[in-house]
Amino acid sequence: MMIREYTPADVPAMRALWRRVFHESEVFLDAFFRLLPDIGSAVVALGESGELLGAAYALTGFEWQRRDGTRAQLGYLYAVAVDEGARDQGIGAALSKAAAELCRKRESAIVTTLPADGPLYAWYEKAIGTRYLLCREAHTAAARKTVDIMKLTGTEYMLWRENLLRGRDFVRLSYPMLEAQRALCEAYGGGLYATEDAVLAAYRDGERLIVREILCARGDPAVSAASAAAALGCSEAVFFLPAESGGEPYVTADAPLSPGTVWNLTLD
């Protein structure tokens, strides 16, 4: 087996593997692979005949912005995938280590990831040393339209977001990374939105609206989340807020991020 950084010639096989493992929307995959050179890179594992055994993505379009003005680039491991016939051979761990190292070579000070489920937090800690957590709290709101919702472009959302997060520790997204976030939301029936008091990024999951980020100037986030759910034909909204203590595990990192750091917009 050989692990190396991907080349454009690898993309068709990488897309096919992604579809088999994650059953992802073609709309999102089109956008993701178009944006990949601007948001990071990837590593691939190849068999003896050059066949693709697995892939992992090393994304670097995130910057930790602290209220004291200091900044640090974050690397983010995403979509580690191994073909079914090549599993249980340590390929996933090897790809994760290679992707983490690629993040560091691309000047990331901290390597992070969002494990898909609970047992994977320990798996990633063993593989790449990610033992520090950001946590969040989940909330629900029944659909009820009390404020108007308007759709935003990526540029509009970025400007609103930066303004609402001024004076807080937060993770800034590069514009191409924000476009990847928008593509993910729109591929599943959502997008980037604003009310008179808030901005939110959301997508549909059946009858639920999954609000991946909601930022309010002063009001109750449940009001805007409920209105967005009603506007998009959902029965309820599930939204998440950063937790300074307690809450459910969210992003895990190989160095500590300040409690309450606002990230929200990872790639799920």
Range-by-range predicted roles:
Residues 44, 51-61, 74-76, 81, ...:
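Conserved beta-strand in the GNAT
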Residues 202, 208-268:
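Charged, low-complexity intrinsically disordered regulatory/assembly segments
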Residues 79-82, 88-103, 219-230:
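Conserved acetyl-CoA-binding loop-helix of GNAT-fold acetyltransferases
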Residues 45, 75-79, 117-121, 132, ...:
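Core nucleotidyl-transferase/polymerase catalytic module
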